[in-house]
């Protein structure tokens, strides 16, 4: 009986917001870092390899008083950026949840770095409409969790669109790629210098040999 009840509960969750029948609940959009990801049920590896996942047990991402939805995604996958640049968000920035033909706007009001087992910041707060974006940190190490929380505000399309500007700073991921490119260029230049120097030494040695003969 318990197993049957659990199966029914799982089935009920999987069908929640599954309007198109493809498992997609909605879309999370973060204008500042130019990210728009589908949100699927759960946070399995299969989901997080391709999209954002809704943390089962948290509120459904449909807004409303006394709700707190949690949306999770990976950072720095070779195949997709996902939440790689989530660390670029600051207090006052906005992100959007597109669900059921509605656009819900959230303003960032809290940014935390916590241990994986610390979920206290994900609790529902009475009367509040909250969404937390969750990912691993530091980049490439992933020993902690970055939580970017927002509270519901009226959606002002132009104000949010204005946040789509070049990033004021480079993320760890972007910095890493930049240093890789710089390293390759420097190595290439160094090899070229050695090659030219070797050629000059060979020519000099050849001339000396000719003069001796």
Identify the function of each model-found stretch.
Residues 1-176, 201-207:
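Solvent-exposed, non-transmembrane regions of membrane-associated and secreted proteins
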Residues 185-199:
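Alpha-helical transmembrane segments
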């Amino acid at each position: 009986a318990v197993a049957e009840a659990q199966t029914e509960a799982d089935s009920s969750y999987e069908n929640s917001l599954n309007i198109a029948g493809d498992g997609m609940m909605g879309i999370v959009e973060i204008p500042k870092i130019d990210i728009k990801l589908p949100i699927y049920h759960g946070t399995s590896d299969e989901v997080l390899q391709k999209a954002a996942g809704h943390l089962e047990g948290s509120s459904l991402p449909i807004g409303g008083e006394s709700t707190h939805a949690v949306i999770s995604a990976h950072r720095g996958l070779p195949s997709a950026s996902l939440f790689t640049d989530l660390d670029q968000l600051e207090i006052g920035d906005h992100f959007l949840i597109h669900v059921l033909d509605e656009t819900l706007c959230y303003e960032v009001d809290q940014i935390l770095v916590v241990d994986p087992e610390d979920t206290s910041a994900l609790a529902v707060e009475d009367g509040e409409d909250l969404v937390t974006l969750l990912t691993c940190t530091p980049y490439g190490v992933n020993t902690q969790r970055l939580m970017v929380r927002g509270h519901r505000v009226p959606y002002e399309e132009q104000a949010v669109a204005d946040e789509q500007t070049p990033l004021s700073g480079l993320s760890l991921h972007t910095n890493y790629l930049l240093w890789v490119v710089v390293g390759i260029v420097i190595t290439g230049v160094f090899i070229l210098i050695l090659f030219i120097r070797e050629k000059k030494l060979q020519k000099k040695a050849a001339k000396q040999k000719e003069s001796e003969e």
